[in-house]
């Protein structure tokens, strides 16, 4: 049928008055190249007749061509220009050049040059980064991969931020994922990733979740039939610095992928295990003022992490016809992350009244705090795609997830130095199973050769129940008893209906799109304590529009500019709405706000990209973000020695910044990528009937520099830096990490060995260390310096035992990972 339509199209095209040339441009991995430049020249004179850029499907067309002999060139940033010669036009003919494949790098006749892909590819709505460029993340997780991107930072607590915002959404192969970002980023092996797309101003066909935009993780795939198998091993050397930790920390892992592909079937099987412990310590001080009494308790001790992940993945894809595709996938896994804080509180004292010399000394004590977070899950998805006769595409997808979240927290205050003395023993659980359903139907068709329209409907259902039991005792020989005021049942039900339309078109060097998404959300939060004093249901419902628009203009082969707008939402998690306190550790209770509103965001950005000599490139993006109902974690005084950490809507914020990146090729062997972000953050609002006002300039820098000794050996240095940052109630200090990676391949690139030196310090720097301070005048002051393990040595081995092309596609969690 498609062949018949193509013949009919050619027939009617011939009836036109003038001749045409049509074709399609893709890369060597069969990815269609949007915005590739195609130029038409007269054969004899080499005069340029005209130029066009490809549309979203890589198609191009030249109209009204006079009779004569011509040739064309097709080019795209980071790829070798390709020339098609001896194109003869006569008698109002249509010439179909078919698929033009561009290869990376540059090759000269009889000269061998090691070609490298550009680190970044800019498109109208996204930046694309190739994972192979970031060797320091080899054998690790996706989290270590994305920290190399401009404007992406990870602080000492493992929190990921994009352009200064911790709110963003994750896509896997274009499929949205709702869940704790740290979980998805820790679970997926970096070896399975082909590239990462940074979508800062998403269109209406994407979910509006995530105030900083979307990060789309694309797993490796290929187009060659056959079998592909790869296994990766990872092992860590013993820790150089012990930090006084009670036991040794282990780091090891393995992951594998096996893929079989033929004309109709694509079957993938994968699994991984990763143990990723981290040693460290913390030094802190807390002071409070309550009832004219000043209390002070400094502390010091171990803060370490034991983390282990297991998962297995299976996907089967069936294409009975070229226009029909059906896929079914399953994903199951277990995750456990234990945070141990064994802290000595020493030199504790109080002064009463405040400002006097009446100082009373407290006893010193030892706090053993073990907080474990578990996440056992299983999910499945079904996808169906059908291409109609008019080349329009109908897609249907269904995803269901069950996740059991939980893990106890143990908090013991013991004697010091005699730890056999028990002052208080607390044990609280937070088992909270989650059920998620997502279904989507969308339809895409071409209005004409250069115009496309997308329409769709989506339904999401979340049922998240929690049973939180808080127990206490004062003697090891006594049983625990229930603390009813801290024990509760919390149930969140959320239903979302969404409709969207997206219009995109292209004319000559100008491309633009506009879209609108309408969303109706219903949220029910059921709260019940075990003291039988609270039993209520809180509702929050709304219907809202999310418009988006983008425009890009290609000035010439080297320069393009773009402008984009997007309206977003950052939804609140169940954890942040749970109003019942949870004992995080001896000096902190943590609780949420049941009336917490989502954040609503308007973002606009202007981008510029310039191709320079020697394949060097420069890009820059100026952005502005306005956020309503900003959610911050703020502190109040609970009692003389405990602070209450609360999540609350504290006001509105404005962020204006600029993001800059550059591909720098110093020589054929030395290539660097540098990216930076600087922005001004202004927050105005109030909390607890007190005004909040903070304004600061924050910047970050990511550097990646690679030197190739030979075609099969290279050395890479990376450096990630985050400046001081003003918060709603204090300041986070600077945070940085340098890394060095040596890589060597053998056996015709089938065996790859990587030696990594992570968090370089040598006792000379303050790598992997950050101080976090919060205060409220005349009420409290707290500062904690987190010092984590440095000079970590890792060895990775990767072996391809079936040398076909990897076409694996796996699914990921949609709901549970946001709550982990």
Language-model regions: role of each:
Residues 37-41, 75-77, 94-135, 155-157, ...:
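Short, acidic, small-residue-rich periplasmic hinge/interaction motif at the N-terminus
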Residues 43-59:
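Short, acidic Ser/Thr/Gly-rich low-complexity loop/linker segments typical of extracellular
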Residues 94-100, 142-145, 183-184, 198, ...:
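N-terminal periplasmic accessory domains that precede
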Residues 142, 148, 175-205:
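Short acidic/polar hinge/loop motifs at secondary-structure boundaries
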Residues 143-177, 206, 213:
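Extracytoplasmic beta-strand/coil segments of soluble accessory domains associated
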Residues 436-438, 481-487, 591-593, 597, ...:
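Outer membrane beta-barrel strand-and-loop segments of large Gram-negative receptors
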Residues 522-524, 557-603, 624-645, 725, ...:
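Surface-exposed extracellular loop regions of Gram-negative outer-membrane beta-barrel proteins
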Residues 627-628, 744-820:
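C-terminal beta-signal and adjacent terminal beta-strands/loops
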């Amino acid at each position: 049928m498609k062949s018949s339509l193509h013949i009919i199209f050619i027939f009617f095209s011939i009836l036109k008055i003038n001749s045409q040339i049509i074709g399609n441009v893709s890369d060597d991995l069969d990815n269609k190249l949007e915005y590739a430049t195609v130029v038409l020249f007269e054969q004899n004179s080499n005069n340029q007749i005209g130029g066009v850029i490809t549309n979203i499907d890589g198609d191009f067309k030249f109209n009204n061509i006079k009779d004569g002999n011509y040739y064309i060139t097709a080019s795209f940033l980071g790829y070798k220009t390709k020339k098609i010669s001896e194109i003869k036009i006569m008698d109002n003919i249509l010439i179909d050049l078919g698929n033009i494949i561009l290869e990376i790098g540059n090759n000269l006749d009889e000269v061998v040059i090691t070609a490298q892909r550009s680190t970044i590819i800019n498109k109208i709505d996204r930046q694309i980064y190739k994972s192979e460029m970031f060797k320091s993340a080899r054998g690790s997780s996706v989290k270590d991969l994305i920290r190399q991107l401009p404007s992406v930072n990870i602080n000492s607590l493992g929190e990921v931020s994009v352009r200064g915002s911790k709110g963003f959404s994750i896509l896997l192969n274009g499929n949205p994922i709702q869940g704790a970002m740290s979980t998805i980023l820790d679970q997926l092996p970096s070896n399975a990733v082909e590239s990462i797309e940074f979508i800062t101003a998403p269109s209406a066909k994407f979910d509006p979740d995530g105030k900083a935009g979307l990060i789309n993780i694309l797993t490796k795939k290929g187009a060659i039939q056959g079998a592909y198998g790869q296994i990766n091993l990872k092992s860590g050397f013993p820790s150089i610095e012990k930090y006084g930790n009670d036991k040794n920390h282990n780091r090891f892992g393995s992951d594998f992928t096996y893929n079989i592909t033929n004309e109709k079937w694509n079957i993938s099987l994968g699994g991984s295990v990763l143990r990723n412990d981290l040693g460290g310590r913390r030094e802190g001080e807390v002071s409070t003022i309550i009832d004219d009494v000043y209390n002070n308790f400094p502390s010091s001790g171990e803060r370490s992490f034991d983390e282990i992940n297991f998962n297995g993945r299976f996907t089967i894809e069936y294409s009975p016809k070229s226009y029909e595709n059906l896929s079914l996938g399953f994903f199951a896994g277990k995750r456990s992350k234990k945070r141990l804080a064994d802290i000595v509180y020493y030199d504790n004292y109080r002064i009463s009244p405040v400002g006097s010399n009446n100082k009373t000394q407290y006893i010193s004590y030892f706090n053993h705090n073990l907080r474990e977070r578990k996440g056992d899950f299983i999910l499945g998805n079904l996808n169906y795609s059908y291409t109609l006769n008019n080349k329009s595409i109908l897609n249907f997808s269904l995803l269901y997830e069950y996740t059991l979240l939980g893990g106890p927290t143990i908090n013991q205050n013991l004697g010091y130095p005699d730890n056999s003395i028990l002052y208080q023993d607390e044990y609280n659980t937070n088992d909270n199973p989650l059920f998620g359903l997502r279904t989507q139907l969308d339809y895409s068709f071409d209005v004409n050769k250069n115009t496309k329209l997308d329409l769709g409907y989506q339904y999401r259902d979340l049922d998240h129940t929690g049973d939180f039991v808080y127990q206490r005792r004062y003697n090891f020989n006594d049983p625990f008893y229930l603390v009813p005021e801290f024990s509760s049942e919390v149930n969140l039900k959320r239903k979302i209906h969404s409709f969207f339309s997206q219009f995109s078109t292209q004319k000559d060097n100008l491309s633009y799109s506009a879209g609108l998404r309408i969303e109706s959300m219903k949220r029910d939060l059921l709260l019940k304590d075990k003291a039988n004093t609270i039993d209520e249901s809180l509702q929050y419902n709304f219907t809202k529009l999310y418009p988006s628009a983008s425009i890009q203009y290609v000035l010439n082969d080297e320069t393009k500019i773009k402008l984009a707008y997007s309206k977003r939402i950052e939804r609140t998690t169940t954890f942040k709405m749970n109003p019942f306190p949870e004992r995080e550790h001896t000096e902190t209770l943590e609780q949420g706000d049941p009336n917490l509103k989502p954040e609503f965001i308007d973002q606009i950005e202007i981008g510029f990209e310039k191709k320079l000599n020697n394949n060097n490139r420069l890009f820059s993006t100026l952005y502005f973000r306005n956020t309503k109902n900003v959610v911050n974690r703020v502190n109040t005084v609970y009692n003389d020695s405990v602070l209450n950490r609360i999540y609350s809507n504290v006001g509105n914020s404005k962020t204006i910044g600029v993001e800059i990146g550059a591909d720098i090729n110093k020589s054929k062997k030395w290539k660097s990528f540098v990216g930076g972000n600087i922005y001004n953050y202004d927050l105005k609002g109030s909390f607890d009937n007190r005004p909040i006002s903070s304004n600061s300039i924050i910047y970050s820098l990511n550097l990646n520099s690679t030197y190739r000794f030979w075609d099969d050996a290279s050395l890479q240095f990376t450096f990630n830096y985050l400046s001081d940052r003003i918060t709603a109630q204090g300041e986070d200090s600077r945070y940085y990490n340098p890394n060095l990676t040596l890589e060597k391949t053998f056996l015709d690139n089938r065996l790859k060995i990587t030696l990594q030196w992570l968090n370089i310090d040598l006792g000379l720097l303050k790598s992997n260390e950050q101080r976090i301070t919060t205060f409220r005048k005349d009420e409290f002051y707290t500062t904690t310096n987190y010092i984590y393990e440095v000079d970590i040595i890792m060895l990775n081995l990767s072996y391809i035992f079936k040398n076909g092309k990897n076409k694996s596609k796996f699914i990921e969690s949609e709901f549970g990972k946001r709550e982990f």
